[in-house]
Amino acid sequence: MTSTVQSPLYSRVFSAVFYGVISVLIVFVNKILLTNYKFPSFLFVGVGQMMATILILFFAKMFRIVQFPSLDSSIPRKIMPLPLLYFFNLISGLGGTQMINLPMFTVLRRFSILMTMILEFYILNVKASKAVKISVGLMIGGSFIAAIYDLSFDALGYTMIFINNICTAALGVYTKQKLDAKDLGKYGLMFYNCLFMLLPALCVVQYTGDLDRAYSFMLSDSMTSSVWTCFLLSCICGFVLNYSLVLCTHHNSALTTTCVGPIKNLFVTYVGMFSSGDYVFQWANFTGINVSVFGSILYTYVTFRSKSTTISYKPLPMTMPIDVHKPRN
């Protein structure tokens, strides 16, 4: 894949690893909260994550820790359609986490990679290399096999993941486009994504009755200190995940952000088979998962190896004499 400006290798690797680690953490935190502790509303959890992001960035700007443009009439034009994509990505991701076992959740999420690759080509004019296409093909092929033989199939859960994949792909590509424009910066994108969608999200939570269910649960004996800790950790992780996603997209491509971390996929996939208790083993399904994981590893190797090689060679000025055009050590 090609890019006009590339960040240093350490920035690209660190941001990708950071995003991968936080992605692992929040998947397990949300899964424990929604499935193990049976918190009744993933929509309410999403609102909590949005409010945490708004409050953290508001006070960080107040104390001059971060900077981003103040709200004015030009902000909606500069940021759209990111808030809508962010909201649907958040809600569908939480819903899928609640309804699908972790191994299948991570495998099905890889379909967003193909969608991202297509959107990058049409919106950002970024063309994937042959090696990248092969690795993506392995990920998608393995995911397809695993999905066919998933014994715990949930139609609504699969629909949630499909919506999540579309939103993830579009969110990554448009985030890259907005970051390149440098109008709002990393923190501005995060703050206004949440601010513009907070009221609509609250309306949805109220309309669906999730607000009453969450409120009743939080006043009951089921809301133990462990559940409170998990809920607050989920809200904070939502902010950190947003930051790590924007940071990774800034230093890498949108496709790399979507594909990030075979370690994340390995860890979540295999540990999730035992930790969540809702995975049903089947050999064909297990084989498909492993093929998809191998594709993830291959993609990461190809991406960072090719980018590292590309950044090492710089064209010499055309005006230099021929005798100085010698290879550099």
Swiss-Prot record:
The chain crosses the membrane at residues 15-34, 41-63, 86-108, 129-151, 155-174, 187-209, 224-246, 253-275, 280-302. This is UDP-sugar transporter sqv-7. The gene is sqv-7. GO terms for biological process: chondroitin sulfate proteoglycan biosynthetic process; egg-laying behavior; embryo development ending in birth or egg hatching; gonad morphogenesis; heparan sulfate proteoglycan biosynthetic process; morphogenesis of an epithelium; nucleotide-sugar transmembrane transport; regulation of distal tip cell migration. Keywords: Golgi apparatus, Membrane, Sugar transport, Transmembrane, Transmembrane helix, Transport. Acts as a transporter of UDP-glucuronic acid (UDP-GlcA), UDP-N-acetylgalactosamine (UDP-GalNAc) and UDP-galactose (UDP-Gal) from the cytoplasm into the Golgi lumen. Involved in the biosynthesis of glycoconjugates that play a pivotal role in development. Involved in the synthesis of chondroitin sulfate and heparan sulfate proteoglycans. Required for embryonic development. Involved in vulva epithelium invagination and embryonic development. Involved in the directed migration of hermaphrodite-specific neurons. It is a multi-pass membrane protein. Belongs to the TPT transporter family. SLC35D subfamily. One of its GO terms (molecular function) is antiporter activity. It is found in: Golgi apparatus membrane. GO terms for cellular component: cytoplasm; Golgi apparatus; Golgi membrane. Pfam families: TPT. The keyword Chloroplast does not apply.
